[in-house]
Swiss-Prot record:
PANTHER family: APURINIC-APYRIMIDINIC ENDONUCLEASE, ENDONUCLEASE IV ENDODEOXYRIBONUCLEASE IV. This is Probable endonuclease 4. Its EC number is 3.1.21.2. GO terms for biological process: base-excision repair. It comes from Latilactobacillus sakei subsp. sakei (strain 23K) (Lactobacillus sakei subsp. sakei). The lineage of its organism: Bacteria, Bacillati, Bacillota, Bacilli, Lactobacillales. Zn(2+) 3 binds at H181, D226, H228. InterPro entries: AP_endonuc_2, AP_endonuc_F2_Zn_BS, Xyl_isomerase-like_sf, Xyl_isomerase-like_TIM-brl. Disulfide bonds: none annotated. Its cofactor is Zn(2+).
Length: 300
């Protein structure tokens, strides 16, 4: 199974540190932001420590590598033209960075219409993607299924399909399926994942599904909240999420966790991923998992 998590990329180690962290978690794939997800400040490509990282990635047989674009980039904005222009320019450079890092997929929250309406937002996203995509690019932009919080677009499979259909170079587009977002959007991941997957296949096509964000949800189906929970400790539950990980139609799709750190406060919290990966590989829910993570400071 292709199973991993978000890992950090920072300091002097950069991508090498990301690969080391993924290996320590017991992962065989991983996702990174090219800088802080809350801003768009980025280091030059030559400072990302790529050659040293590539050697470790090959030695540990890690991959595919997934890049996540920052949250604050909004291609759906028709209200502020300067924000839309900035989003295009940033994402053009993000594609170049992702390719240099060896990433095959760039996860992108499609955008929010900020009050102009979903149709206007979708048209603007299509316009932006048509400016960003290059015929020769190797990394795909993987539009993420959204929870429908606020004015987000992409909460329904039909909206994602509309974006893809409107883009000229849509062979450069794929989809990230987030289990928390999709449940929060109203799809029954907990009890009928096969049915949801069949609907996705009918509307978008399974050949477009290139990344899965494997997250439990703190809120019930249809809540439109987007609050991730640790695997098995939310409203979707362990059995359903383990079923996603082991699904025969999704063997070659990387499953990436973005579950919350565990601890009493922000100064004393620990990455859950080594434990969650081990639990999913074992196939048995551990109700004491969060206590163990905190007691052992995230180390197995």
């Amino acid at each position: 199974m292709l199973l991993g998590s978000h890992v950090s990329m920072k300091g002097k180690e950069m991508l090498l540190g990301s690969a080391q962290q993924a290996a320590e978690f017991g992962a065989n794939t991983f996702m990174i932001y090219t800088g802080a997800p809350q801003n768009t400040r980025r280091k030059p490509i030559e400072e990302l420590n790529i050659p040293a990282a590539q050697a470790l990635i090959a030695a540990k047989n890690l991959g595919p590598i997934v890049v996540h674009a920052p949250y604050i980039v909004n291609l759906g904005n028709t209200v502020k033209p300067e924000n839309f222009k900035f989003a295009i320019e940033f994402l053009q450079q993000e594609v170049i960075r992702a390719e240099a890092l060896g990433a095959s997929q760039i996860v992108l929250h499609p955008g929010a219409h900020v009050g102009a309406g979903a149709d206007a937002g979708i048209k603007q996203i299509i316009k932006g993607l048509n400016e960003i995509l290059r015929p020769d690019q190797t990394a795909q932009i993987a539009l993420e299924t959204m929870a429908g919080k606020g004015t987000e677009v992409g909460r329904r499979f039909e909206e994602i399909a509309q974006m893809i259909d409107g883009v000229t170079l849509n062979d450069k587009l794929s989809v990230t399926f987030d289990t928390c977002h999709t449940s929060d959007a109203g799809y029954n991941i907990r009890e009928d994942f096969d049915g949801v997957l069949n609907e996705f296949d009918h509307i978008i096509g399974l050949d477009r599904l290139k990344v899965i964000h494997l997250n439990d949800s703190k809120n019930p189906q249809g809540a439109h909240k987007d609050r991730h929970a640790n695997i098995g400790f939310g409203e979707i539950g362990f059995d359903a999420l383990h079923g996603v990980v082991t699904h025969p139609q999704l063997v070659d799709v990387p499953k990436i966790m973005e579950t919350p750190y565990v601890g009493k406060d922000k100064k004393h919290n620990f990455a859950p991923y080594a434990y969650e990966i081990a639990m999913l590989k074992k196939g048995e829910f551990d109700p004491d998992l969060l206590t163990k993570i905190e007691q052992n400071e995230g180390r197995l």
